[in-house]
């Protein structure tokens, strides 16, 4: 909130692994009310966490920049399914429930 009050940022970068989904949505609402642009980023997340971020971005539609890199070591990925990535786009399956991930 201090960032918004002091006007010291043009963008806020939201990362679900640092805030969680509900807090990310709160941050987005505060930023939008102050006309601060939003971007979403990630760290080394599983398909499940990445799927949550992709769904949030698609559902909210308020992000100017999206930096959601796929898992860099697919052999260590604990989940199957989730959003399909074909640079620079993610595709969500209309046929799978929820995030669309299952445990390997």
Give residue spans per PLM region:
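Flexible C-terminal active-site loop/helix
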Residues: 6, 43-104
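Catalytic core of soluble alpha/beta enzymes
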Residues: 1-49, 76-85
């Amino acid at each position: 909130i201090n960032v918004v009050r002091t006007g010291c940022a043009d963008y806020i970068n939201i990362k679900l692994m640092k805030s969680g989904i509900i807090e990310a949505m709160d941050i987005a609402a505060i930023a939008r009310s102050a006309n601060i642009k939003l971007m979403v980023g990630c760290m080394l997340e599983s398909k499940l966490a990445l799927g949550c971020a992709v769904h949030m971005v698609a559902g909210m539609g308020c992000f100017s920049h999206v930096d959601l890199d796929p898992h860099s070591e697919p052999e260590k990925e604990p989940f199957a399914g989730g959003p399909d990535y074909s640079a620079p786009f993610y595709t969500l399956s209309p046929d799978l429930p929820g995030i669309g991930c299952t445990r390997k």
